[in-house]
Amino acid sequence: MSSTKNVLAIVMAGGEGSRLHPLTAERCKPAVPFNGKHRIVDFVLSNLVNSEIYSIYLLVQYKSQSLIEHIRQSWTMTRFIPQHFVTVVPPQMRNGPEWFQGTADSVYQNIHLIESFKPDIVAVFGADHIYRMDVRQMIDFHVKNDAHVSVATLPVKLADCNQFGIVETDDNHRIVDFVEKPQTPPRPMPGSSTHALASMGNYLFNADILLDALREAHETGHSDFGKHILPAMLKSHRLMAYDFDTNTIPGTEPYEEHGYWRDVGTIDAYYQAHFDTLGATPRFRMTNRHWPIYASPDQAESAQIENGVIHRSVVGSGSIVDGASLDNAMLRRSVVVERDARLEHCIVMERSRIGRGAQVRRAIIDQDNDIPAHERIGFDLEADRKRFHVTASGIVVVPRQFFKPQSLQSTTPSIGRARPSVASASEGSGLKVAA
């Protein structure tokens, strides 16, 4: 059914990500690294491509250079099939010297792209979440129900409703109310006293309906899908709620959390989502050959491990672990961990070094940091707050280049008997190397 429809995807990747500061001090939210070699934006793009949706515009805005470079290096599709593309679209200011004023305004400012492509359906998706989704199943639902607009939904706790667009439906999944980030708890969803139905920020529009709605919203000064466009369409159009819980992904293991979806818009949520991917039976398995999450081509050498103990950790390519201890650690590419250093529940980003005897726990080390020998981070939070960002739950974030790196290349420790890590170490399963 859905294969007969011409689908254009528009991914809204302009989010500033202020709640992820300082990780977003130099990059936009979709460009923030995730796991051993991915960025957050890779999840929505992989879902679209795996769903055989190959015509994708990526709308960017804030601090977008690293995202643009990532797309150029990782998501360049064939030049010989015109409708296969992932194209970055910065603000064009076609309607005046203004940046995007909201989600709907970002699409309106690029309305010419929709008009020239002439799709049947426009998929307007966010770029801020960790999940797998077969978008074709949502398209089938959209077509089967003669929907003008379909909104992907899932249950959230009532206490968290002020972070989401909340929908109310009738018995046939038609949306009868839509409130963006309500300040008072909404009515629970049918069959639950503790949860309401929330929008995932993923929408399907019939193209003609979307074009009319965007033009009308522009005339009235409305700029946001959740705040303005969707509530205004309730009486005049058929809006349907797609139940994300019904979405099935091939290759999902029985131990994985069904319908895993995480909004990683805060440091705490971002940190926890990493550890959902670790271990032999993770909540969310990064490797699935039937539904891969694509990453940039890896030109680095294999990781090298000499002695030390590694438990339930990821060691990125080009990294060196020399007689150190890793417990629930996530090392991205080209990280060096020197002898007698210890990392516990840590995320360490590219080209960082953990000096000899340093101890770090419950921390995120942004890229290009040279942690001094015998440094202690995460053990005295009051002292850490004077230097770093520390969340209410005690997660320490060391900003990019806080510890100015010296020449990482010239001081890389020599490992005469270095061994490449086994593949599973860089893909998320635990690895223990005995001394």
Swiss-Prot record:
Its EC number is 2.7.7.27. The keyword Nucleotidyltransferase applies. Residues 408-435 are annotated as: Disordered. PROSITE patterns: ADP_GLC_PYROPHOSPH_2. Pathway: Glycan biosynthesis; glycogen biosynthesis. Keywords: ATP-binding, Carbohydrate metabolism, Glycogen biosynthesis, Glycogen metabolism, Nucleotide-binding, Nucleotidyltransferase, Transferase. One of its GO terms (biological process) is glycogen biosynthetic process. Alpha-D-glucose 1-phosphate binds at G165, E180, K181, S199. NCBIfam families: PRK00844.1 (NF002023). Homotetramer. Belongs to the bacterial/plant glucose-1-phosphate adenylyltransferase family. PANTHER family: GLUCOSE-1-PHOSPHATE ADENYLYLTRANSFERASE, GLUCOSE-1-PHOSPHATE ADENYLYLTRANSFERASE-RELATED. Involved in the biosynthesis of ADP-glucose, a building block required for the elongation reactions to produce glycogen. Catalyzes the reaction between ATP and alpha-D-glucose 1-phosphate (G1P) to produce pyrophosphate and ADP-Glc. This is Glucose-1-phosphate adenylyltransferase. The lineage of its organism: Bacteria, Pseudomonadati, Pseudomonadota, Betaproteobacteria, Burkholderiales. The gene is glgC.
